[in-house]
């Protein structure tokens, strides 16, 4: 393990690798985004560019899939999501290497999370913030990355939290291309799975129970070689929870559901009425007819304090968690399908 100095002047909120693991983007309360590249000869991380991106703390960033170019999305407490594209013709460390494509400013509250969808769903992203509304945007014309369309809105919280209260919101897309479009969303103490139905709209498919305090992080595991899905959460109560998600579908039904989901990938649906209320009857009906079964596989409190981040490896076999104890723990399933801590990493290693 080799640490590097980010050079930020304030708290670093997010650190994200690109698809190939050769670049790292960081964001901070100093309102700057920094991009580092890996030097193959020295294995050191070198600054590629740094720029002031928002008017308030930047709390989340994400890389788009590489087939759409080198694009970064950033979310901030200034209530905006901004998209950035690299210009390789500009000199490194000039502050001009990343150009702003557009600003998405539909949110009425501070934003906490932004994530690009898996590549097979097209160029789209989701964001979630303090107004309690999940928003999905599509680049309907990939040749024009400056034009993004708001295609879905879902009211995750009936009443948004007061500004003076501590809150947190996270989201994670289902990476499986063999499953209908789904994403897991955490808002305060609740975690919900949304799925796009045959009507082209997002509906509540399942809820992840048992959380008794703020959920700080949620991560949907890749399901390579596995017939079920895994979702992990990290919470303020110091616990890591790993859930098993089973889809009750026959192969024929799965194929039909996937086909119907793909038909509506680019549909412009808004799931709230003119007064901003979600169709609760439709959601309840969809939840009752949900094909998802949720089971709590493991629950651990090894960090002895708040858990701030959970993340899966590329194969979905190892989970990493980071907490207030200043340690990163790696978790792996045993033959009995129970997750055990296999390694503990500290900053001194």
Curated annotation (Swiss-Prot):
WD repeats: 7-46, 53-94, 106-147, 153-192, 210-253, 302-341
Gene expressing this chain: SEH1
Role: Functions as a component of the nuclear pore complex (NPC). NPC components, collectively referred to as nucleoporins (NUPs), can play the role of both NPC structural components and of docking or interaction partners for transiently associated nuclear transport factors. Involved in nuclear poly(A)+ RNA export and NPC biogenesis. It is also required for normal nuclear morphology. Component of the SEA complex which coats the vacuolar membrane and is involved in intracellular trafficking, autophagy, response to nitrogen starvation, and amino acid biogenesis.
Phosphoserine PTM sites in chain numbering: 257
Further comment found in the protein's record: Present with 952 molecules/cell in log phase SD medium.
PANTHER family named in the record: NUCLEAR PORE COMPLEX PROTEIN SEC13 / SEH1 FAMILY MEMBER, NUCLEOPORIN SEH1
Quaternary structure note: Component of the nuclear pore complex (NPC). NPC constitutes the exclusive means of nucleocytoplasmic transport. NPCs allow the passive diffusion of ions and small molecules and the active, nuclear transport receptor-mediated bidirectional transport of macromolecules such as proteins, RNAs, ribonucleoparticles (RNPs), and ribosomal subunits across the nuclear envelope. Due to its 8-fold rotational symmetry, all subunits are present with 8 copies or multiples thereof.
A single MF term (Gene Ontology): structural constituent of nuclear pore
Topology with respect to the bilayer: Peripheral membrane protein
Pfam families: WD40
Native organism: Saccharomyces cerevisiae (strain ATCC 204508 / S288c) (Baker's yeast)
Protein name in UniProt: Nucleoporin SEH1
């Amino acid at each position: 393990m080799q640490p590097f100095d980010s050079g930020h002047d304030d708290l670093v909120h997010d650190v994200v690798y690109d698809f190939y693991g050769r670049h790292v983007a960081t964001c901070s309360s100093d309102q700057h985004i920094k991009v580092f590249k890996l030097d193959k000869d020295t294995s050191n991380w070198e600054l590629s560019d740094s720029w002031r991106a928002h008017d308030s703390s930047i709390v989340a960033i994400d890389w788009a899939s590489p087939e759409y170019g080198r694009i970064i999305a950033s979310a901030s407490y200034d209530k905006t999501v901004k998209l950035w594209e690299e210009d390789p013709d500009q000199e490194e460390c000039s502050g001009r290497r990343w150009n702003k494509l557009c600003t998405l400013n539909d949110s009425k509250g501070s934003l906490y999370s932004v994530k690009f969808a898996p590549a097979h769903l097209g160029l789209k992203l989701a964001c979630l913030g303090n107004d309690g509304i999940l928003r999905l945007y599509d680049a309907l014309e990939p040749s024009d990355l400056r034009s993004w369309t708001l295609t879905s809105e879902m009211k995750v919280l009936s009443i948004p939290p007061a500004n003076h209260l501590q809150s947190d919101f996270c989201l994670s897309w289902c990476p499986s291309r063999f499953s209908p479009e789904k994403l897991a969303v955490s808002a305060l103490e609740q975690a919900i799975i949304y799925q796009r139905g045959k009507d082209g709209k997002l509906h509540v498919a399942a809820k992840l129970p048992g959380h008794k305090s703020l959920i700080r992080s949620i991560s949907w595991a890749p399901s390579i070689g596995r017939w079920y899905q895994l979702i992990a959460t990290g919470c303020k109560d110091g616990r890591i929870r790993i859930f098993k998600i089973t889809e009750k579908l026959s192969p024929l039904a799965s194929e039909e559901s996937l086909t119907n989901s793909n038909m509506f990938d680019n549909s412009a649906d808004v799931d709230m009425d003119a007064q901003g209320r979600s169709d609760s009857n439709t959601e309840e009906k969809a939840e009752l007819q949900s094909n998802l079964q949720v089971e709590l596989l493991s629950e651990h409190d090894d960090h002895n304090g708040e858990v701030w981040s959970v993340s899966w490896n590329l194969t979905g076999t190892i989970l990493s968690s980071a907490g207030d104890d200043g340690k990163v723990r790696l978790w792996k399933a045993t033959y009995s399908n129970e997750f055990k801590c296999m390694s503990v990493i500290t900053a001194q290693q």
